[in-house]
From Swiss-Prot:
One Gene Ontology cellular component annotation held by this UniProt entry: plasma membrane
An MF annotation (GO) of this entry: dihydroorotate dehydrogenase (quinone) activity
Keyword Nucleotidyltransferase assigned: no
Assembly and interaction partners: Monomer.
Protein's UniProt name: Dihydroorotate dehydrogenase (quinone)
Compartments, as annotated in UniProt: Cell membrane
Main location as per UniProt: membrane
Catalytic residues of the enzyme: 181
One Gene Ontology term from the biological process aspect of the record: 'de novo' pyrimidine nucleobase biosynthetic process
CDD domains documented for this protein: DHOD_2_like
Catalytic reaction list: (S)-dihydroorotate + a quinone = orotate + a quinol
Keywords noted in UniProt: Cell membrane, Flavoprotein, FMN, Membrane, Oxidoreductase, Pyrimidine biosynthesis
Length: 363
């Protein structure tokens, strides 16, 4: 059944109920090799022009799944069959927590937007570690998005990130430090330069310690930032990835926004806004980060991608890779293959020989 036929049925359900059903279906599919192969044939696009390498990892294509969908690594075995070049699970907190009261997810089909105030619900890092340990391998890179528990005081936030890192160190290909969700009280205060530098120093030290202890390279550390920062903040954050001893190896830009477009007054629920209204705001942050880092630091662009043109706009702004989530709600899983099949034509039409030459050209 095509997603166009299925979507009206899914949209009669509570958004969180629809999400739970999709996770359950993919979790079951992960145990069905023949089913996975059929799904992969339908949704996977193979094109060597899309392949890139960052942080010592190979990305067969630049389109990943953003954190927020597979919070507890239940669907991780099946998700590569949908054509993603990489998967980011989480957000994972060190201890289980229920998140914020329901309802906490709201669809706006006319605006192709979602507002959520989830608050990092999840089973905790130990449960996620057990599931990831059971995977037979990583056909695509797997990132793990880390957050702090709601009841952990801000002054002890670094303890939560380090605790989660210690539990998950062996099971991800990169780690993302999430200090930008608007749905955990005070979390965005950790984006302040002094607090952020202290947090990242603690996480980087733990990463190096674990690498030495287990005689393996440290994990690439990425930082996920909000779209609501000004250019001075972005310049300061960009500096954390520069120099001889960078505290982070890349950025994910951006999380959801707390701002509401004046042109769309119907987006009234509190929480983080994602989807189409976030596209331009996210792109502006990507471009500023690209300039602040002189294009030397990989950026994963996320926010408002509903087409290949949207993904390409993020690459032009300076993104090396992109992620989708809200776009899948409105366009379905075929969005990934559509982007991958159309991207080369977009950069060739603009006269670029490859993806790397297109990157950052409008920043």
């Amino acid at each position: 059944m095509s997603y166009g036929l299925l979507r009206p049925l899914l949209f009669t359900l509570d958004p969180e109920r629809a999400h739970t059903l999709s996770i359950a279906a993919l979790e079951a599919l992960g145990h069905m090799p023949r089913g996975l192969a059929r799904v992969a044939r339908r949704y996977t696009a193979h094109d060597p022009r899309l392949a890139q390498d960052f942080w010592g990892l190979h990305f067969a294509n630049p389109v990943g799944l953003a954190a927020g969908y597979d919070k507890d690594a239940r669907a991780t075995a099946a998700l590569p069959a949908l054509g993603f070049g990489f998967i980011e699970i989480g957000t994972v907190t060190p201890r289980p927590q229920p998140g914020n009261p329901r309802p906490r997810v709201f669809r706006y089909p006319a605006q192709q937007a979602v507002i959520n105030r989830m608050g990092f619900p999840g089973e905790g890092a130990a449960a996620v570690a057990r599931r990831l340990a059971a995977l037979p391998g990583h056909p695509v890179p797997i990132g793990i998005n880390l957050g702090k528990n709601k009841d952990t005081p801000l002054e002890r936030a670094q303890d939560d990130y380090v605790a989660a890192l210690e539990l998950l160190f062996h099971y991800g290909d990169y780690l993302c430090i999430n200090v930008s969700s608007p749905n955990t009280p005070g979390l965005r205060l950790l984006q302040g330069e002094e607090a952020l530098r202290g947090l990242l120093k603690a996480v980087a030290a733990a990463n190096q310690r674990l690498a030495l202890q287990h005689q393996r390279p440290p994990l690439p550390l990425l930082l996920k930032i909000a779209p609501d920062l000004d250019n001075d903040d972005l310049n300061a954050i960009g500096s954390l990835a520069l120099g001889t001893a960078p505290l982070v190896n890349g950025f994910i830009a951006t999380n959801t926004t707390i701002e509401r477009p004046a042109s769309q007054p119907g987006l009234s629920e509190s929480g983080g806004l994602s989807g189409a209204p976030l596209l331009q705001q996210s792109n502006a942050v990507i471009a500023q980060l690209y300039r602040a880092t002189q294009g030397q630091v990989p950026i994963i662009g996320v926010g408002g991608i509903l087409s290949a043109a949207d993904a390409y706009a993020k690459i032009l702004a300076g993104a090396s890779l992109v992620q989708v989530y809200s776009g899948l709600i409105f366009r379905g899983p075929g969005l990934v293959r559509e982007i991958l099949e159309e991207l080369p034509g977009l950069w060739l039409k603009d006269g670029y020989p490859d993806l790397a030459h297109a990157r950052g050209s409008t920043a």
